[in-house]
Design a protein with these regions (language model features):
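Single-pass alpha-helical transmembrane segments
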Residues: 384-408
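Solvent-exposed, extramembrane regions of membrane proteins
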Residues: 1-18, 36, 245, 255-385, ...
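Extracellular/lumenal ectodomains of secretory-pathway glycoproteins
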Residues: 1-320, 487
Length: 488
């Protein structure tokens, strides 16, 4: 399912495609405030750059307006998610490790206590290093993986500390007790880039790889391809959430921000009414159970979540922009919002795979059932239209048609009665097609006419119109009608 959400985010967010499938939700996309030049959200100068980092702020999303839960203002809920990401340094947080009795070396990364019971070396991640001495001077591109590898580790906050199910306990520079921490480890392996990559997460400037382009002549020197600067680059993200009761005063309507596991509990006291509290808990349980924040996208899809792979073929990649990492994170963020939209709607629709029924959590009180029955879902088999707009268009069009037929005779009548601009009126009438024909026939001098100043002139009863004079075939003209057939 997540891959379908990813496709929807690519096709529909920012209204790029206008596809019919983009009408799946009450809102085609959820707008987000994005700061692409944010300061480092972490401490101890651990970010690769002090500025040029990224922050996503959804603002206060409304359960009615943004997620389609049809409810009066006093039953609505607001939800906000803020995500901050930055590439972080590996210098000082990385060590090389060689397996005993082996030539295989690994890079180990130390961003906290990983709770690894089987090792005294509490690293958070390790990845094999590329030994260029065994890679045939860098020309054997098949000797290592020629695709991306991405791995994720998470540290969830709960009640002012890190939850027992967190993957690791972060170092002080990465700790923030009101937001979850997610680390994304990226390796480009033996991917060769056609140009140097200055992006801080995809950074590639090592020119040890040569490639003999089959398009070039046999005597041509090999092309230089650039590979990753280090075995792994690390991207760190904070994600925090917040709920608000829009019916409370502004200074007390929102809960403190917190991680995804605790944000709903922090907001539980905002609703004193038991009915509204049950409605909030159901809504928040959907958000929390889905748990689709931006980090989940690479966590579940792996390297398929990277848009940089679109330009990858047989281990070779074209150039990447300097902000490729920001494009990747923005793509994950949008996919996570689509997933949130879809899961809220799917909760009301129910499951399509009955094999999942044993794990289905059904609404068990009146308020929860009411929320499910109040979900607005678009149906592609039907179309909505405005009756007022349609009626207004028909009425206006009919009025224009009537005026187009009635305006000329009405004005002509007024002009005749008041003797306004008689010459202009008669010239207008005389230039009509039927009046021009009347003038031509009348010049013969044999036909008597009525309505010579009207739109449609007619002959008197029994009058015959002129006929063509064909004595000069190159210059036909009108003549009086013959008295007998022989006179034609």
């Amino acid at each position: 399912m997540l891959s379908s959400y990813e496709n929807y985010a690519e096709d529909c967010y920012d209204n790029v495609s206008g596809l019919g499938s983009c009408n799946a939700f009450i809102k085609a996309d959820i707008p987000t405030k994005i700061d692409t030049n944010a300061s480092c959200p972490f401490g101890d100068d651990i970010c690769k750059h002090e500025y040029g980092n990224i922050v996503f702020d959804t603002g206060y999303l409304d359960s009615h307006l943004d997620f389609g839960i049809n409810a009066p203002p006093n039953e609505r809920i607001q939800f906000r998610r803020v995500s901050s990401c930055a590439p972080i340094k590996t210098d000082g947080y990385r060590k090389s490790y060689r397996l005993p009795d082996s030539n295989n070396s690994y890079s180990r990364y130390y961003y906290g206590d990983s709770h690894v019971d089987y090792s005294d070396d509490l690293y958070t991640y390790e990845y094999p290093e590329i030994n260029w001495d065994t890679q045939t001077s860098g020309q054997d591109v098949n000797a290592a993986r020629t695709d991306y590898t991405i791995y994720q580790s998470n540290a969830f906050v709960l009640n002012g500390s890190y939850a027992s199910y967190a993957d690791f306990l972060p170092i002080p520079a990465l700790r923030k007790m009101d937001a979850d921490l997610h680390l994304m480890y990226l390796s480009s392996n033996m991917i060769g880039y056609s140009e140097e990559v200055d992006d801080p997460w995809f950074s590639a400037h090592v020119d040890k790889m040569k490639w003999y382009n089959p398009v070039n002549s046999p005597d041509a020197p090999p092309d230089t391809l650039y590979t990753q600067d280090e075995p792994v680059s690390v991207l760190a993200c904070y994600v925090s959430e917040q709920y608000c009761n829009p019916n409370l005063p502004e200074e007390t309507r929102c809960s403190p921000v917190g991680g995804i596991s605790e944000s709903a509990f922090l907001a539980d006291g905002l609703w004193q009414n038991a009915k509204h509290q049950r409605m909030f808990r159901w809504f928040a349980s959907i958000i929390m159970a889905s748990g689709v924040t931006l980090d989940v996208v690479p966590g579940l899809l792996g390297d398929a979540a990277l848009t940089a792979r679109h330009g990858l073929q047989l281990g070779h990649s074209g150039p990447l922009p300097d902000n490729q990492w920001q494009l990747e994170v923005e793509h994950w963020h949008r996919t996570s919002l689509v997933a949130t939209q879809a899961i809220i709607a799917d909760t009301a629709k129910g499951i399509s795979d009955m094999h999942l029924e044993p794990w289905l959590v059904r609404p068990n009180n009146t308020e929860e059932k009411h929320l499910c029955n109040s979900q607005k879902i678009r149906n592609a088999e039907y179309f909505n239209f405005s009756v007022f707009g349609l009626a207004f268009t028909l009425a206006l069009g009919s009025l224009i048609i009537v005026l187009s037929y009635a305006l000329e005779p009405i004005l002509g009548c007024v002009q005749r009665r008041r003797s306004w601009d008689t010459y202009a009126r008669l010239e207008w009438v005389s230039n009509e097609t039927l009046q021009l024909q009347r003038l031509a026939h009348e010049e013969v001098g044999l036909v008597k006419w009525e309505g010579c100043a009207e739109n449609v002139p007619v002959t008197e009863k029994g009058e015959k119109l002129a006929v063509l004079d064909l004595h000069d075939l190159e210059h036909p003209r009108l003549k009086a009608p013959p008295r007998t057939f022989a006179g034609v």
